[in-house]
């Protein structure tokens, strides 16, 4: 079942990415609204069940784990930096930088809220032992009646996030391959990319993913850092070329 679900999600991501970046971006905006609304529901259900004493880090051992956790989180979030591969397909807008900063601030606020819910209901010790502490936390939420269980809602929202992430990855890989081959990537090569992503994702789908929480986040940071440095260097080269032409 996990393999079939992975294949289905990846096929949906390929179908969305095949429509081009504009259509993919519009679909992701709809996904964002759905995920945001779902998270607000989870927050409203969970905020009243927090044990605030569990949210404070009292011991030196707990405080010592904060830097490693922050670095791992940064590596996971760095996957969004792969969108830099798509800069050539977009145009800058007035106030775009401010809008990006506001969205990043909202994203980190939501992430902090999720961490607060997990710690306030599970505690740091139990959260470190379970595989998916957020889903474990959600399993204890709900009221009698229509909202008795929220796992189904969270699972559906999780799939939307996976589709968006895989679609972004396929678009970025397609752009990188087109740059390497110096020509557009057709549907045949896009199928090869999708198949390669599926094969690489099989260990995680089968539950054998020892590198997912360690090397993958750090790999994201390394790739995005190298990409940013390359773009900065290219920008300096263009400035130098302009100054030489003026001179």
Where are these regions (language model features)?
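Hydrophobic alpha-helical segments and their helix-loop junctions in multi-pass secondary transporters
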Residues: 17, 34-59, 74, 119, ...
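Alpha-helical transmembrane segments of helical membrane proteins, especially in multi-pass transport
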Residues: 107-122, 148-197
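Membrane-interface interhelical connector segments
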Residues: 121-151
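Selective recognition of specific alpha-helical transmembrane segments in multi-pass small-molecule
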Residues: 12-14, 33-47, 102-127, 189-204
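Hydrophobic, membrane-embedded alpha-helices of multi-pass small-molecule transporters
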Residues: 5-6, 18, 43-49, 58-110, ...
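Membrane-water interface regions at transmembrane-helix termini and the short interhelical loops
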Residues: 9-31, 89-94, 207-211, 234
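Small-residue-rich transmembrane alpha-helices that serve as helix-helix interface/gating elements
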Residues: 194-196, 212-230
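Extracellular/periplasmic helix-loop-helix junctions in multi-pass membrane proteins
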Residues: 181-187, 201-220
């Amino acid at each position: 079942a996990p393999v079939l679900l992975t294949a289905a999600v990846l096929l949906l991501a390929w179908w969305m990415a095949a429509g081009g970046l504009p259509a993919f971006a519009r679909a992701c905006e709809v996904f964002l609204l759905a995920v945001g609304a779902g998270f607000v529901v989870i927050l409203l259900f969970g905020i009243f069940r927090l044990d605030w004493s569990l949210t404070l880090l009292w011991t030196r051992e707990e405080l010592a784990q904060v830097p490693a956790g922050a670095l791992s989180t940064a590596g996971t979030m760095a996957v969004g930096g792969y969108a830099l591969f798509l800069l050539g397909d977009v145009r800058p807008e007035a106030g775009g930088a401010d809008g990006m900063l506001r969205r990043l601030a909202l994203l980190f606020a939501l992430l902090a809220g999720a961490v607060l819910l997990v710690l306030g209901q599970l505690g740091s010790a139990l959260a470190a032992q379970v595989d998916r502490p957020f889903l474990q936390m959600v399993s204890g939420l709900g009221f009698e009646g229509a909202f008795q269980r929220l796992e189904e809602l969270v699972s559906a929202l999780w799939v939307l996030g996976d589709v968006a992430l895989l679609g972004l990855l396929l678009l970025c890989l397609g752009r990188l391959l087109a740059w390497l081959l110096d020509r557009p990537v057709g549907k045949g090569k896009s199928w090869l990319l999708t198949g390669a992503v599926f094969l690489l994702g099989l260990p995680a789908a089968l539950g054998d993913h020892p590198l997912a929480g360690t090397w993958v986040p750090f790999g994201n940071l390394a790739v995005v850092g190298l990409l940013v440095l390359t773009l900065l260097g290219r920008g300096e080269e263009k400035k130098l070329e302009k100054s030489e032409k003026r001179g």
